Amino acid sequence: MKTKFVAVILGMALLGASSVACAQFGGLGSKLSGVTGGSSSNVSPEGIVTKYVGGAQNVNKADVKMLRAVGLKEEADRAELQAKNLTEGATQGSLEDATKVQTDSSKALQEKFASGKVEMDEKSKKQFADGMVDLAHGLLAYVGMSKEASGFKPAPTAIGSSSLSAAYVVKTLPDSIKSLGSTLKSSIDFAKTNNIPVPKEAADATSAI
């Protein structure tokens, strides 16, 4: 009888130890799963769109200031209107419009730089320099979120507006960074040629490209 009692006690002890071990390894499995899954498990489509819009707003502000500074008022007005229309809950269509305006603004600026026909007073030079700071901030925002965005993989069943917008951001972000980087470098060259002090933020941002 005593032997049976001891056997029961030992069996219960082993069962308890087994349960603890399973719980511990189960927790470890969850942790490993989180690691191997990367940051994508913590990335929401809404978060990606919100961060992208924040960067895009800086780029739009930069475009408005720099375009006006070099006398491109019509293009500046277009960029300003786009800035007002772009919100945190932007749809894919809104983001496509924003990308087009940014591309058109960059093209207009670079063509103006190349023309050599730019007259600027001290006020416009300061406005141009301020725009370079905004452009640097926008570019760094894009670069900063690029790694996070690259880890985003929408679920196969995700058909919501935010998921479509986030997928668009992931697809176009590398080209946007490349385009803005080129515009910033051209702006720095233009500033140096026209005796416009180059802001530290602009110079530093080029190293992040």
Locate the predicted segments by residue.
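Immediate post-signal-peptide N-terminus of mature secreted/exported proteins
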Residues: Q24-Q92, E96, A205-I209
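Bacterial N-terminal signal peptides that target proteins for export
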Residues: M1-I9
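N-terminal signal peptide c-region/cleavage motif recognized by signal peptidases
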Residues: G16-V20
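Extended amphipathic alpha-helical interaction segments
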Residues: D97-I209
